Amino acid sequence: MGEEVVQALVVDNGSGNVKAGVAGDDAPRSVFPSIVGRPKNPGIMVGMEEKDAFVGDEAQTKRGILTLKYPIEHGIVTNWDDMEKIWHHTFYNELRAAPEEHPVLLTEAPLNPKGNRERMTQIMFESFNVPAMYVAIQAVLSLYSSGRTTGIVLDSGDGVSHTVPIYEGYALPHAIMRLDLAGRDLTEYLMKILHERGYGFSTSAEKEIVRDIKEKLCYIALNFDEEMKTSEQSSDIEKSYELPDGNIITVGNERFRCPEALFQPSFLGKEAAGIHTTTFNSIKKCDVDIRKDLYGNIVLSGGTTMYEGTGERLTRDITTLAPSTMKIKVVAPPERKYSVWIGGSILSSLSTFQQMWITKEEYDESGPSIVHRKCF
């Protein structure tokens, strides 16, 4: 490669959405659902070209006649054939870039199994012939995008939540906590409590409607019990939502009962600790000398931290748990839905990062296990 730096492609593979674009941009060019849809009844789709699978938005718009599958569950790839379809769609249809001409930066969940990183590496070099690639931990990228190298990231997306303490740019694996409770669980919980109100949402297509209701109307109460009392006495918190068929439904205390499950997982029948306790426990697992830096830099990341009131409530609940002299600061960047991608864009355009790429030569020499030596 000459002196001219070829732009890298940055792909953040989330359980819910793929965020993809070009290094150096300040936002992803393409955001689409991580879905592969296949016809329920092959052969009866009149006027549609015989495609065996649809990816992303196209799968979303034809969802009535398709079975939708998410190849990434709880942040980790479980179906590699579908994942390859998603990557193919990302490069050729969304970014319209030839992967063999660009280095590719991919993201992974914290504590991603070793075999998974190797598989990602193998597919990039062997199926897509990339010249170079790198796999970065999602939470670390979010921290970079907030302009920090030390802090604790609470990253909550569609499939999984993690608290990841990071010191001088390195994640501390022994203190990472994983919570299998995220956006998809909240969508399912909202379906359930709307059912109790008499609104029956059940199909995979209707689930997408409920996800939209959740994103538009839900918020986090500063004090849940008070909010419940208030909602019983007045109808101020009721909001209406228009369904695709024109019917209008009313959503009341479901608006804050749904995301409350982040703080009280028992609502979902889970025994886990809430996000406030998980963050606190993660910090407690770190060396006593760095805790002050972590408490003062709690950085939110991911779509499930976007509810109004998240930052305030987290500050209040962690302050209650932490030593009384400790200064607690929760940082909620406005672009946190995309902060993993933005961090990847920043990292892969740094001149100092250019020697970090795994090159095709290195891969050919060492095989997929090279990823453990070069990406950490």
Swiss-Prot record:
Record GO cellular component, one term: nucleus
Activity regulation info: ATP hydrolysis occurs in the polymeric state. Unlike for mammalian actin, ATP hydrolysis also occurs in the monomeric form and the release of inorganic phosphate (Pi) is more efficient.
InterPro entries per record: Actin (IPR004000), Actin/actin-like_CS (IPR020902), Actin_CS (IPR004001), ATPase_NBD (IPR043129)
PROSITE patterns reported for this sequence: ACTINS_1, ACTINS_2, ACTINS_ACT_LIKE
Enzyme superclass (EC): hydrolase
Keywords, ordered alphabetically: ATP-binding, Cytoplasm, Cytoskeleton, Hydrolase, Nucleotide-binding, Nucleus
Highest taxon in the source lineage: Eukaryota
GO BP terms: symbiont-mediated actin polymerization-dependent cell-to-cell migration in host
Record EC number: 3.6.4.-
Compartments it resides in: Cytoplasm; Nucleus; Cytoplasm, Cytoskeleton
CDD domains: ASKHA_NBD_actin (cd10224)
Self-association state and partner proteins as the record states: Monomer (G-actin). Oligomer (F-actin). Polymerization of globular actin (G-actin) leads to a structural filament (F-actin) in the form of a two-stranded helix. Unlike for mammalian monomeric actin, parasite monomeric actin is able to induce oligomerization in the presence of ATP or ADP. Mg(2+), which is used to coordinate ATP, is required for polymerization. Interacts with MyoA. Interacts with DNase I with low affinity.
PANTHER family: ACTIN
Protein name listed in UniProt: Actin-1
Source lineage: Eukaryota, Sar, Alveolata, Apicomplexa, Aconoidasida
Encoding gene (name): ACT1
